Each structure stands twice: as structure tokens, then as C-alpha cells.
């Protein structure tokens, strides 16, 4: 679920719509939630326990775990977003095409998944093979 939240937040950054909502697995069961207050978005598991947070300052968003320890960063670029681990090593990137589909890549440039948003505002996450793995709204 942590990976899903990371991808979710990048998608929210890309669309500028990070406010509050729920996350679901591929079967439609609720797995957690997220809520934004100012420049900070906090994530929760399905029981309401805090799992982490994201704080944005300019073009850089820093990810923290539930204890407040820095876990990595997301930096906005001209082509999308690039992610880094807590040591500053590049871990991947996200790019959005003209159709509104966001594709995620690993540090070697290999596709790892994608995100698509429908007309109702629900964003669905797919793995590299196109299989649905979760959604949020």
C-alpha cells in the first residue's frame, strides 16, 4: 500500500487535486485514505492509523514515514516528476501524456505501471502489464 500511496500522491500533484479521499484495492475494498491541510498531505490505513505524510515546498515534495523520518523526495521537472530515496539516489520518474495517462518508470527507464482518471474523477492504477491493482477517489 505504501507504493500505491506514493503513486497516488504523484498523480495528485500532477492534477493539482490533492484534498481528501479514499484508496481501494483491485477488488474495490477500501485500503486507506488521505487528507491535505495546506502544503501537507497525510496518509492513513483503513483503520485510520497514520502511515505517513508528504510536505511540498515549491517544486519539491518530501515524503515522511509515520514517525516523521524522511523517506525520500519527489521533484517536479519539465517532463513530469522524478523520485529519489532518502539518500538522494534517483529511484524513478512519472510522465503524463496528452491523453492524461500518467506512466511510472523505474530508475532504468523501464515502465512499472500507469494511472488513468475517468470522467467521475476516479483514478485507477495499473501494473506494467495493464492489470488493475487499485484506485482512489
Protein language model features and the residues they cover:
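Sec/Tat signal peptide C-region and signal peptidase I cleavage site
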Residues: 16-20
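Bacterial N-terminal signal peptides
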Residues: 6-15
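Intrinsically disordered, low-complexity proline/glycine-rich segments
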Residues: 21-137
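Positively charged n-region of N-terminal signal peptides that target proteins for export
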Residues: 1-4
Amino acid at each position: 500500500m505504501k507504493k500505491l500511496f506514493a503513486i497516488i500522491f504523484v498523480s495528485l500533484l500532477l492534477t493539482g487535486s490533492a484534498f481528501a479521499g479514499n484508496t481501494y484495492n483491485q477488488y474495490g475494498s477500501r485500503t486507506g485514505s488521505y487528507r491535505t491541510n495546506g502544503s501537507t498531505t497525510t496518509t492513513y490505513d483503513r483503520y485510520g492509523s497514520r502511515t505517513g505524510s508528504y510536505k511540498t515546498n515549491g517544486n519539491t515534495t518530501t515524503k515522511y514515514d509515520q514517525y516523521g523520518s524522511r523517506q525520500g523526495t519527489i521533484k517536479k521537472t519539465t517532463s513530469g516528476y522524478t523520485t529519489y530515496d532518502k539518500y538522494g539516489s534517483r529511484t524513478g520518474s512519472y510522465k503524463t501524456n496528452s491523453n492524461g495517462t500518467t506512466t511510472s518508470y523505474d530508475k532504468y527507464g523501464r515502465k512499472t505501471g500507469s494511472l488513468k482518471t475517468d470522467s467521475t474523477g476516479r483514478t485507477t492504477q495499473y501494473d506494467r502489464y495493464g492489470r488493475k491493482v487499485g484506485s482512489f477517489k
